[in-house]
């Protein structure tokens, strides 16, 4: 799949033919519960939705994201919360992006919707930099979990085949080192462990502006946005 994705980009850009990598590959043993997937654009969204739909009840769902605006994914998070999953979200406050000052769109508007339905949410405590993480951790049945991370923001622009994106989805038992580190990292950020300030309370960047809510909706709907 990796070669196919790279070959597609080369065709679009008029590049030379891709040289196939030499050497063998080793497949993960499906009986062990391990699975590794390389996903691009729309397939990232499909995987995220599948993960959220398959989440164990009760089970942990932990999302760390730079931009969150895709309506299907937001709905899936709300549905998972309603089913009894333990959902927590850390978002960039959308106040800085690539050296420019922003007005909070789209994350503060999305956050308001999540918090209204009692999903705990914290902001990355940024100081001019960006919380450029795109990571979704979901616990499944049979003591398994899937970790999805890479370049794709959870927005229409990134997930509906308008921008070249690439993510990895890794499924393994809950006790696998990767899953343990993913949970520990999220907990450290969430709780500001060891005196380090990683996140801030929701109220710090809460935004009740109706105009900005409409703006966020229009930008996500039309695609006329930077996210």
Show the residue positions of the predicted features:
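PLD/PLD-like phosphodiesterase catalytic module centered on the HKD motif
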Residues: 56-60, 67-227
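Glycine- and other small-residue-rich loops at beta-strand/loop junctions that grip anionic moieties
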Residues: 37, 41, 65-66, 124
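Short amphipathic alpha-helical segments, especially helix-boundary/capping motifs
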Residues: 22-26, 50-53, 86, 111
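Short, contiguous clusters of charged residues that form electrostatic/catalytic patches at enzyme active sites
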Residues: 43-50, 71, 75
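Short, Φ-rich (hydrophobic/aromatic) sequence segments
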Residues: 5-6, 52-53, 186-187
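Active-site cores of enzymes that catalyze phosphoryl transfer or operate on phosphate-rich substrates
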Residues: 1-48
